[in-house]
A protein has these predicted regions:
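A short helix->loop->beta-strand "cap" motif at the edges of active sites that frequently abuts
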Residues: 117-124
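Short, flexible active-site-adjacent loop segments at beta-strand->alpha-helix junctions, enriched
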Residues: 9, 52, 91, 130-133
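Conserved beta-strand segments of alpha/beta enzyme cores
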Residues: 45-47, 123, 165-167
């Protein structure tokens, strides 16, 4: 099976860092074997496209090419014969600077997926954002109100998946690190097991 994993820093494998937003921060990622998508590598051709700061529908003021809705046409056209696309997006859209409600974030995701479906007939799986924990200087500054948003997004994403016949994985209760937004190794393992189980359920007919 040809699988594209497309997402943000939790797809990239960002190691939680309480000083991650400071200008001298050293940003590191987990070894690939500790990332949630590694469990899919057996018997599958895997493409991983994760970028720190990637949003569904917003530009990032520090990093270029992080608006998925603006870049997806050129990105998705690079990949052929995809059977499954797994999207892990929405966390960055919860930042207080964007002022997006859960409904707006979900509508933006739906529009992004419609763009993707113009290029491919691949099955779609969406992973809802993990619950932002507003208990530290990072989340209190950049993610004010995001804990409630991520809780609501879980049901919004699930409803979208049901309406559009997408696969759905809840990321809500995965283990989160000290920065309140990034997965720990345990969180990656928890997610990897869920995704692998869902992928194993797919029959060839469902991939057409």
């Amino acid at each position: 099976m040809n699988i594209l994993c497309y997402g943000d820093s939790n797809t990239w494998g960002y190691i939680p860092n309480i000083n991650g937003y400071s200008k001298d921060a050293i940003i590191r990622h987990y070894d690939e074997k500790d990332c949630w998508w590694y469990s899919l590598k057996n018997h599958n051709k895997l493409i991983v496209n994760g970028l720190c700061g990637r949003c569904i529908a917003h530009e990032n003021r520090w990093l270029k090419n992080r608006n998925a809705s603006a870049t997806i046409n050129s990105e998705i056209s690079q990949y052929t014969n995809l059977d499954l696309i797994i999207l892990q997006l929405g966390t960055n859209d919860c930042k207080s600077e964007y002022e997006d409600s859960p409904d707006v974030i979900t509508k933006n995701l739906d529009m992004l997926l419609k763009i993707i479906q113009k290029h491919t007939c691949a099955k779609i799986m969406i992973i809802s954002p993990s619950k932002i924990i507003e208990n530290n200087k990072i989340t209190q500054k950049y993610y004010k109100g995001a804990q409630s948003k991520t809780i609501q997004l879980d049901s919004c994403y699930k409803r979208l998946a049901e309406q559009r016949n997408f696969l759905f994985i809840s990321g809500l209760n995965l283990d989160i690190g000290e920065d309140g937004e990034h997965l720990t190794k345990l969180g990656h393992k928890q997610l990897g097991l869920q995704v692998l189980s869902k992928v194993k359920e797919l029959s060839p007919a469902e991939l057409i």
